[in-house]
Amino acid sequence: MDFEWDTEKARINERKYGVSFFEAREVFGDELSSTIRDPDHSVEEERLLIFGQSSSGRRLVVSYTERESRFRLSAREMTPRERKAYEQ
């Protein structure tokens, strides 16, 4: 998978949510991850949410879209409710 992100957006995401995009992309390698469509944010383009764990053990939600064979993403830690669903 080829990932891309805006450097400034990456800084903002890390400052706001404490998740770097380098860590966020690790979720795509989690064998237990699950992906759903994000209808609330799929107005101009389809966005998906992947729920998974990074190599450091943090459980993350990564929102992503594919543009020209590259993935653009945003990430945050799972809420307690999301974490419970992921663990089941």
Q: Locations of the language-model features?
A:
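Ribonuclease/tRNase effector modules and their secretory precursors
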Residues: 1-88
